[in-house]
């Protein structure tokens, strides 16, 4: 996606025309009104044990057949959540790692790193070590299904991997970082683009204009020129996945703030990381969770080893917080939150 990412930034720029820490003894929230606030749990420790601890702090048991949705990472991307980090949590819930194929290719010479069909995706999954620890399921390997969407201003349904029907509960285990198109990637991105099949990704990225993936046409202004439409489509699709699992056994959300490049794990050769690792946050509200992470980045100070400037610039350039704002507007969650430290 190296060449594609550079092209997309040009297209979307046209279309879109400290380490300060939360005080663990006080509430850190977007609004002083204590009503209708979500709890966001925080640990500054990033470790296998910390992931289990923050899962338990939520007080929601993962029941039945548990899907753990991650990004397996493009082949040469070094920043994805490593299996060694997440293994204790996945084993704790007897979970299956779930993913879907992508909707883009990489530049010449990087074809081995692609994940746009199951054959090459499985090679990357094995190379990144996931099959050494867990059962893994590419949910759109064989089929896809449509699930209902509440907010239909852009997309009329969400096209997701067909194997989603095999699971009762989802843990959205998200790597928080930048994203070339969304500005940032967190819970809302992993729920929407992450759970969508290749065709579903095209449908969301094009704001409902393309239902059958055509990579030669998708990444052109005709299909991805509506930046806010794309962000609103992501929010709608995230709500669809959340509603799907809430009608089953449930869903929870965990954001890991480490290796925070301005580029997503879908970028084969991401920009260097300029931010220090921060911690792990978790919530039963994906909107509050992403808002808390963005606020943490906003509150970072520039030091010799920590510089949020590029990530904040990318979020602003791509209008990234609009996804959070729209998700709140359509009733997916609230941007008001209270930080609860578990350290």
Regions found by a protein language model. Give the residues of each.
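C-terminal motif of bacterial Sec signal peptides marking the signal peptidase cleavage site
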Residues: 13-16
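Bacterial lipoprotein signal-peptidase II cleavage site
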Residues: 18-25
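Sec-dependent signal peptide recognition
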Residues: 2-7
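Extended, low-polarity segments enriched in aliphatic/aromatic residues
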Residues: 35-87, 92-343
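Acidic/polar, low-complexity intrinsically disordered N-terminal segments immediately downstream
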Residues: 25-34
């Amino acid at each position: 996606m190296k060449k594609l990412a550079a092209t997309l930034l040009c297209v979307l720029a046209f279309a879109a025309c400290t380490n300060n820490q939360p005080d663990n003894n006080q509430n850190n929230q977007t609004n002083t009104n204590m009503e209708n606030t979500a709890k966001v749990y925080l640990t500054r420790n990033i470790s296998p044990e910390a992931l289990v601890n923050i899962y338990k702090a939520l007080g929601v048991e993962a029941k039945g057949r548990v899907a753990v949705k991650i990004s397996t990472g493009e082949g040469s991307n070094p920043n994805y959540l490593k299996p060694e980090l997440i293994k204790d949590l996945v084993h704790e819930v007897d979970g299956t790692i779930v993913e879907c194929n992508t909707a883009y290719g990489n530049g010449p010479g990087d074809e081995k790193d692609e994940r746009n069909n199951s054959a090459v995706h499985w090679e990357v999954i094995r190379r990144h070590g996931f099959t050494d620890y867990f059962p893994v399921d590419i949910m759109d390997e064989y089929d896809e299904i449509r699930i209902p969407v509440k907010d239909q201003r852009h997309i009329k349904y969400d096209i997701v991997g067909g194997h989603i029907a095999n699971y009762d509960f989802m843990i959205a285990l998200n790597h928080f970082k930048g994203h070339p198109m969304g500005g940032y990637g967190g819970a809302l991105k992993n729920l929407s683009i992450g759970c969508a099949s290749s065709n579903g990704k095209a449908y969301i990225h094009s704001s409902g204009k393309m239902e059958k993936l055509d990579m030669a046409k998708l990444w052109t202004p005709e299909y991805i020129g509506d930046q806010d439409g794309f962000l609103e489509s992501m929010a709608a699709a995230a709500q669809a996945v959340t509603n799907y699992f809430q009608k089953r056994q449930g869903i929870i959300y965990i954001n890991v703030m480490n290796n925070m490049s301005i580029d997503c794990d879908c970028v084969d050769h991401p920009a260097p990381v300029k931010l220090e690792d921060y911690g792990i946050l978790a919530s039963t509200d994906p909107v509050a969770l992403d808002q808390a992470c963005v606020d943490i980045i906003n509150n970072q100070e520039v030091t010799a080893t920590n510089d949020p400037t590029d990530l904040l610039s990318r979020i602003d350039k791509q209008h990234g917080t609009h996804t959070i704002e729209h998700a709140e507007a359509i009733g997916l969650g609230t941007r008001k939150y209270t930080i609860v430290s578990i350290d």
